[in-house]
Amino acid sequence: SLSAAETTMNHATALSTYVEALNTHSWDRIAPHVGADAVFIFTEDTFIGHAAAKAAFEKTFKLIENEVFSLHDIVWTVVMDDVATCHYEFRWKGLISGQEASGGGRGTSILRKVDGRWLIAHEHLGPYPRK
């Protein structure tokens, strides 16, 4: 059964709650926010479903210690009863081999409402445009 917070959560709150979960670096905390057949398109590959996504996220968490991931300038382009899509700038910072590192780019997310809960259905993260 859903908590009161989950049933009243809208698409925007669901996205920010997902980002909070990402910053725990725990797949067990992230997974409840991700659809079973979610697609993640990252620079290195495309990952479909929980098992593939878990492996990709855990590889990143090992590579970037203490990573903090954030979204900026979120624009919701389509919001319907059970689907919402947005684009944004993402940023990350952390330690790679003990050295401070950071980066970012542009992203698109599609959330789908499943059994009353907004879940990540699709996430595409890519570089900033070449100037």
Label the predicted regions:
Residues G104-K131:
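Short beta-strand edge/turn micro-motifs at domain boundaries
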Residues I96-G98:
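Outer-membrane beta-barrel domain signature
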Residues H87-G94:
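Generic short beta-strand segments
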Residues A12-A14, W27-D82, Y88:
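A solvent-exposed, acidic/Ser-Thr-rich amphipathic alpha-helical stretch
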Residues A4-A5:
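Boundary at the C-terminal end of the N-terminal hydrophobic targeting segment
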Residues S70, A101, G105:
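Exposed loop/turn and edge beta-strand positions of beta-sandwich/beta-sheet ligand-binding modules
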